């Protein structure tokens, strides 16, 4: 049997105990049955289609919990919502009202009709797709850049450019708590159990707070440079972080140790998404491809080619379909064509 390969990259290499890197990583003995099966599927479903969504760059894409709708937020100050009809996205509505760029959005975890947008105009807005109206506008203290909805649906957390995270009651639309951090806050997320709140920061750390008390539980030295994004797997077994060192690290939720690294990207990892079964992890950056890895082995499962940097990816909650959006083309081609499009990978080749 081959000797275990060393895990390289994150700064806590070789330590043991919670919040550290596992000092070794198992070597896979060839592709798993799952990898072979998904590769076979993608060979027949490797088509990527573009759908016009906005008049400027798309910052964020997200699926409703039932997978019927995809929402996108853009530099053009609007959100768009599409219906998924078989093998295509059909634009349902455009949501206007923000006075600045829509930097991030997310859906209610269990109500497929509600989504929330975070904007540089110092507000968040909650929208209902049934009425196509904004049902609440909540004023915040700064320019908002990230947002997440708690798994129980009761709270929305929003982070701004001044590293303040505000917790807003999703029913009363009032602020419940506010935390000012002394470090650069990048992405924020609850764990699946709703009892801990995670932040990635500019020092390469993952900060964990108890929830709702918001008391510090642990700070994990995850990467030697800026820790940019974080996602929890739907099964509740792992979470993944992406960093400016171009590494994706996979962490055991209970032990808080790094179990695996993914190192196929060359540029800072901007966005991550787990597939609905928790078995695939998509990661993207300024590299002109999206890496799709098998979670349990780290093996490369597929590569989605792009013509420009990718800053948002989202797996469908029920099917192996990946929504994503890229940066505007850099003048090499007709720059107007790609600006504001949403893309869908995993469609049948003959569609």
From Swiss-Prot:
<comment type="similarity">
    <text>Belongs to the THOC3 family.</text>
</comment>
<keyword id="KW-0539">Nucleus</keyword>
<keyword id="KW-0507">mRNA processing</keyword>
<dbReference type="GO" id="GO:0008380">
    <property type="term" value="P:RNA splicing"/>
</dbReference>
<dbReference type="GO" id="GO:0000445">
    <property type="term" value="C:THO complex part of transcription export complex"/>
</dbReference>
<dbReference type="GO" id="GO:0006406">
    <property type="term" value="P:mRNA export from nucleus"/>
</dbReference>
<keyword id="KW-0853">WD repeat</keyword>
<feature type="modified residue" description="N-acetylalanine">
    <location>
        <position position="2"/>
    </location>
</feature>
<keyword id="KW-0007">Acetylation</keyword>
<dbReference type="InterPro" id="IPR040132">
    <property type="entry name" value="Tex1/THOC3"/>
</dbReference>
<keyword id="KW-0508">mRNA splicing</keyword>
<dbReference type="Pfam" id="PF25174">
    <property type="entry name" value="Beta-prop_THOC3"/>
</dbReference>
<keyword id="KW-0694">RNA-binding</keyword>
<feature type="repeat" description="WD 5">
    <location>
        <begin position="222"/>
        <end position="261"/>
    </location>
</feature>
<keyword id="KW-0813">Transport</keyword>
<keyword id="KW-0677">Repeat</keyword>
<feature type="repeat" description="WD 2">
    <location>
        <begin position="97"/>
        <end position="137"/>
    </location>
</feature>
<dbReference type="InterPro" id="IPR020472">
    <property type="entry name" value="G-protein_beta_WD-40_rep"/>
</dbReference>
<feature type="repeat" description="WD 6">
    <location>
        <begin position="264"/>
        <end position="303"/>
    </location>
</feature>
<protein>
    <recommendedName>
        <fullName>THO complex subunit 3</fullName>
    </recommendedName>
</protein>
<feature type="repeat" description="WD 4">
    <location>
        <begin position="180"/>
        <end position="221"/>
    </location>
</feature>
<keyword id="KW-0509">mRNA transport</keyword>
<feature type="repeat" description="WD 3">
    <location>
        <begin position="139"/>
        <end position="178"/>
    </location>
</feature>
<dbReference type="GO" id="GO:0006397">
    <property type="term" value="P:mRNA processing"/>
</dbReference>
<dbReference type="GO" id="GO:0016607">
    <property type="term" value="C:nuclear speck"/>
</dbReference>
<dbReference type="InterPro" id="IPR001680">
    <property type="entry name" value="WD40_rpt"/>
</dbReference>
<dbReference type="GO" id="GO:0000781">
    <property type="term" value="C:chromosome, telomeric region"/>
</dbReference>
<comment type="subunit">
    <text>Component of the THO subcomplex, which is composed of THOC1, THOC2, THOC3, THOC5, THOC6 and THOC7. The THO subcomplex interacts with DDX39B to form the THO-DDX39B complex which multimerizes into a 28-subunit tetrameric assembly. Component of the transcription/export (TREX) complex at least composed of ALYREF/THOC4, DDX39B, SARNP/CIP29, CHTOP and the THO subcomplex; in the complex interacts with THOC2. TREX seems to have a dynamic structure involving ATP-dependent remodeling.</text>
</comment>
<dbReference type="InterPro" id="IPR036322">
    <property type="entry name" value="WD40_repeat_dom_sf"/>
</dbReference>
<comment type="function">
    <text>Component of the THO subcomplex of the TREX complex which is thought to couple mRNA transcription, processing and nuclear export, and which specifically associates with spliced mRNA and not with unspliced pre-mRNA. Required for efficient export of polyadenylated RNA and spliced mRNA. The THOC1-THOC2-THOC3 core complex alone is sufficient to bind export factor NXF1-NXT1 and promote ATPase activity of DDX39B.</text>
</comment>
<dbReference type="InterPro" id="IPR015943">
    <property type="entry name" value="WD40/YVTN_repeat-like_dom_sf"/>
</dbReference>
<feature type="repeat" description="WD 1">
    <location>
        <begin position="53"/>
        <end position="94"/>
    </location>
</feature>
<dbReference type="GO" id="GO:0003723">
    <property type="term" value="F:RNA binding"/>
</dbReference>
